[in-house]
Amino acid sequence: MVSLTDLFLASLLVPTSPWLCLPPRIDTIDQRGGRVTLKQVRNPRGHKAFNPARATYRTFLKYGVPAPDYIKKAVAHIDEEQEEAFARIKRDTGSAAAIPINEVDIAYVTPVTIGTPPQTLMLDLDTGSSDLWVFSSLTPSNQVRGQEIYSPTKSSTSKLLSGHTWSIRYGDGSGSRGTVYTDNFTIGGLEVKSQAVQAALEVSSMLTQEQSLDGLVGLGFSALNTVRPSSQLTFFDNARPNLDEEVFTADLKYHATGSYDFGFIDSKKYAGNITYTAVQQSPGYWTHSLSGYSVGSGAFQASQISGISDTGTTLLYLPTAIVTAYYRQVQGAQNSQYYGGYVFPCSSTLPTFTFGIEGARFTIPASYINYTRISPTSTTCYGGLQSSSGLGINIFGDVALKRAFVVFSGTNPPRIGFAIKPLAS
């Protein structure tokens, strides 16, 4: 199996554009004006509760890094506390309870259709990976837990990509793998014909537990695609030549449905100018640098902080020194191995956190960082800002990306842009 870390390291040895040495683009696309807006929807199959330690555990595994033992134990501790809280509430009130799923913004997904006739699945658009994979009719039934599946045999336009397979290894040694088909793939009216669709033969238990997700649409660079013997182009790379502009944008929201735009930049979604910064091409991720940070009303600390803008990662992971400086200003905050990260009394007042993109500044509201309660009855909250120690890379996840209107530009060389936008109340 190939891990994302293996691909990251190997790609550092290749000082070329991320689009070289890849198969030709598909040129049969229904562009419908060359632009499309994709609105997220709230998936009714969301979990009854969100385990924040599991979010950190998944981030380690996603990037091919073994998670520390204390994080594994923290997942179990929080699961146990949540189940005890649910049982206690049901016993006391006679009805089940849950942390409202929209409190943690994990149930928002994008509907797509695959094949002829179209099969609808709910997928996550993920700038931190480059595989378009789905639960399928080939996935063992004991690895499917409520997900919708893609059945290639029910599509008249599906074709097996003979001899091609895909395989991803995660940091705990588990993995997902499968076979590859080409089929019509449509998001929001934008159709790519003969898009590579990676049908799962095996899915890790981590992904089986994600009942709200039927798979991923990777929007990283195609150089990171794990199909072998020949890497396949991502949906965006297949669509790029037929879009009005070679861009897609992310307008993620706090406790609300966000949207993605392909092929254009909607000026109504942001204010002022878009500040662009260079993408470090060789890794294949949307890797770039922040220009510094500040905590609350403190002075801005100029510092180059390299990391990945990843819409598929929930939290914001930064160097330990920065995270420590932040939580030093939160009464009662502690770096808890029991809970797998920084926690604090839910009643504590949190400061804002500001990050820089070149000369522009973006302030994350304190409410975004007061991420979630440990359980429905807990008075302890988990922070949306956590240390990247052990990961080997900083991750600018949704907690940060919700603060800005973000432009992913597929120009050569690629670049990423951030703009101020109105925030949800």
Swiss-Prot record:
Residues 1-28 form the signal peptide. GO terms for biological process: proteolysis. Residues 29-91 form a propeptide. Keywords: Aspartyl protease, Cleavage on pair of basic residues, Disulfide bond, Glycoprotein, Hydrolase, Protease, Signal, Zymogen. The active site is at D126, D310. Glycans are attached at N184, N273, N370. Residues 108-419 form the Peptidase A1 domain. PROSITE patterns: ASP_PROTEASE, PEPTIDASE_A1. The keyword Protease applies. It is an enzyme of class 3 (hydrolase). InterPro entries: Aspartic_peptidase_A1, Aspartic_peptidase_AS, Aspergillopepsin-like_cat_dom, PEPTIDASE_A1, Peptidase_aspartic_dom_sf. One of its GO terms (molecular function) is aspartic-type endopeptidase activity. Belongs to the peptidase A1 family. This is Podosporapepsin. The gene is PAPA.
